[in-house]
Amino acid sequence: MILYGSYTSPFVRRIATTLKLYDLEFTNIELKTSNAAQLSELRSKNPLGRVPAFETDAGTLLIDSIAILDYLDRLVGIKKSLIPSDFEQRTTVMTQVGILNGAMEKTVSAVYEVEKRPEDKIHRPWLEQLHQQTKDGMEAVDNLAMTPWINGEKMTQADVSAVVFLDSIKQVRPNDMPSLECPKLVALSERANSLSAFSETYLERA
């Protein structure tokens, strides 16, 4: 299996961490959208030219991290999957993952707002709203979190997403924006990053 994209992307790192937690062998080919040559290769894997892209052992190409995670869950089966098979538990975890996805996507949009526009074209109210949405989403999950994992005794995909996304958000969140008040998720990140599946996929954004 091949995972395309850099671990500096939280969505790529989430897939890589999940693969490691599932003890699945894979190759990572680092393709960045900011590199013209690499972007051209990436488009041959994903017509949208975005990461992650994923190639199965059968040569099937998958795009979008949620679709890739669904494939991996089905590959390892319900006993090992980080998404519970129980209907109510599954709904809870998927709701949490949805909130976390949204929070991360708002931070990505905020980064693009600053990095892709001339300074005089940045719309400050929109930027502030994006960062507030990230804050609201992460704090909502923090308020729901139990211990040692978000849903109690067993790690789920909500934990993987929360750790990977919090680590990424902390790297790029401006000091002039309200800080995230997520003590439970901070503790979760510290604990999870002591595990090799997380530590081996952690990269600082340049």
Locations of regions flagged by a protein language model:
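GST-like domain detector, emphasizing the conserved glutathione-binding G-site
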Residues: 1-124
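Serine-centered coil/turn micro-motif
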Residues: 9, 87, 156, 182-183, ...
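Non-transmembrane alpha-helical segments in soluble domains
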Residues: 69, 73, 94-97, 138, ...
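Short, hydrophobic secondary-structure boundary micro-motifs
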Residues: 80-85, 149-153, 178-179, 199-204
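GST-like fold's C-terminal all-alpha helical module
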Residues: 100-190
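Charged/polar, low-hydrophobicity segments characteristic of intrinsically disordered regions
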Residues: 135-138, 143, 193-206
